[in-house]
A protein has these predicted regions:
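Active-site residues of response regulator receiver
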Residues: 7, 54
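Two-component/phosphorelay signaling modules centered on CheY-like receiver
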Residues: 10-31, 45
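Helix N-cap/capping motif at the beta->alpha junctions
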Residues: 32-41, 62
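Short amphipathic alpha-helix used as the core "switch/output" element in two-component signaling
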Residues: 41-42, 63-73
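As written
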Residues: 48, 62, 74-75, 94-99
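Receiver (REC) domain active-site loop signature in two-component systems and cognate sites
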Residues: 57
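Interdomain helical linkers/hinges and coiled-coil/dimerization scaffolds
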Residues: 86, 91-94, 98-131
Length: 131
């Protein structure tokens, strides 16, 4: 599964790439960009299965990115990353079809495997259902 990371916080973006054992769970990080506009440019030129995106970003935020991709790239799935623990953000993201909503505040390195396993299972079950 090819993954794109989208976050305006460079340290968070690079840290997420480094801290997770992506390959163990069948993921390959194919890129990381700093905002939704850059994400759209990347998606138009590279195959991606799942986008891990922050919500609050300049230009195009994570929820807007989800909406725009739903029209242009309906096969791409999303995982939302956010410092907001506000339930309404999570609820909106899930209603829009996000595979998961991960709080950056309560996120710990110990959870990485659990998160990737959960996302992988959800993604693969959706792909299996659509076949």
């Amino acid at each position: 599964m090819k993954v794109l990371i989208v976050d305006d916080d460079k340290l968070a973006r690079k840290g997420l790439v480094a801290i997770m054992d992506w390959e163990k769970y069948g993921f390959e990080v194919v890129g990381d960009v700093q905002n939704g506009r850059k994400a759209l440019e990347f998606l138009r030129n590279h195959p991606v299965d799942i986008v891990f995106t922050d919500i609050d970003m300049p230009e195009i935020d994570g929820l807007e990115l989800m909406q725009m991709c739903g029209e242009e790239f309906p096969e791409i799935k999303f995982v939302i990353l956010s410092v907001y623990e506000n339930f309404s953000y999570a609820q909106t993201a899930i209603r829009m079809g996000a595979l998961d909503y991960i709080s950056k505040i309560s996120f710990s390195p110990e959870e990485c495997g659990t998160i990737l396993e959960r996302v992988s299972e959800k993604y693969l079950s959706l792909i299996h259902i659509s076949e």
